Regions:
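Sec-dependent signal peptide recognition
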Residues: 2-10
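A generic structural signal for beta-strand entry/edge sites
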Residues: 13, 123-127, 152-154
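N-terminal signal peptide c-region/cleavage motif recognized by signal peptidases
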Residues: 15-19
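Early exported N-terminus immediately downstream of N-terminal targeting peptides
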Residues: 24-101, 105
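Solvent-exposed loop/turn segments at secondary-structure junctions
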Residues: 78, 95-96, 134-135, 164-167
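Surface-exposed, charged secondary-structure patches
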Residues: 99-141, 196-199
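Short beta-strand edge/turn micro-motifs at domain boundaries
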Residues: 140-142, 146-169
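Low-complexity, intrinsically disordered terminal/linker segments enriched in charged
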Residues: 159-199
């Protein structure tokens, strides 16, 4: 189940066309177009895995608010860091995030995606509710997207919840565990991130 969730997180967060502005700015339509394009892209056997990875890195940088996600996952420790340490963390987190996504690259086919509805929480956030329809090979999977709309013309994905599991919260808890076990030494977290990136 964990492997399935990781794969769905990968699909949900990173795949769309190379032109981020080709999608509608209305949150429900944006997510619907993005994911349906994603499934088609990843199931295309004419695209090599290497080319998919390159495309995915560009896509993620355009459509996911990686900087905001990184600051959230770092937690309150970010308030104690100097500018050099923050700059280093942001750079490492971006590389960590991209590798984490591309390492889940696989093939997708015969997955039916549906938008269930949405809930505008504020002027800057909308939760889009969706699901992967049940099939003979997998159960129904519910996915809720947190879409940041401060710039109405360019929505960004800040989090998603797959069957109750928040990607952002899970990552924050993982980093907090590392820091709490090492007296909040940010250099230990840097080492862990570098180890993953270079592995």
């Amino acid at each position: 189940m964990r492997k399935l969730i990781n794969s769905l997180v990968f699909v949900a967060l990173v795949v769309t066309s190379t032109n981020a502005y080709s999608y509608d700015s209305e949150p429900e339509i944006f997510i619907d177009e993005l994911v349906k394009d994603a499934i088609g892209t990843l199931s295309d056997k004419n695209i090599s895995k290497a080319d998919k990875k390159k495309k995915i890195e560009i896509i993620a940088l355009e459509n996911v608010d990686i900087d905001a996600l990184g600051m959230y996952t770092l937690g309150s420790v970010r308030k104690t860091l100097d500018q050099d340490s923050l700059k280093k963390y942001k750079s490492l987190f971006e590389k960590y995030f991209l590798k984490s996504l591309t390492s889940r690259l696989t093939d997708y086919s015969d997955q039916k995606f549906e938008i269930i509805g949405s809930d505008q929480k504020s002027e800057t956030y909308t939760i889009v509710n969706s699901k992967i329809v049940e099939s003979s090979s997998q159960p129904e999977i519910k996915i809720n997207w947190r879409v940041y709309t401060k710039n109405p013309a360019k929505p960004l994905i800040r989090d998603l919840v797959v069957e109750g599991l928040s990607l952002a919260k899970t990552q924050k808890e993982e980093f907090a565990s590392i820091l709490n076990s090492n007296n909040n030494d940010i250099n230990i977290l840097f080492l862990k991130l570098e180890e993953f990136i270079n592995n």
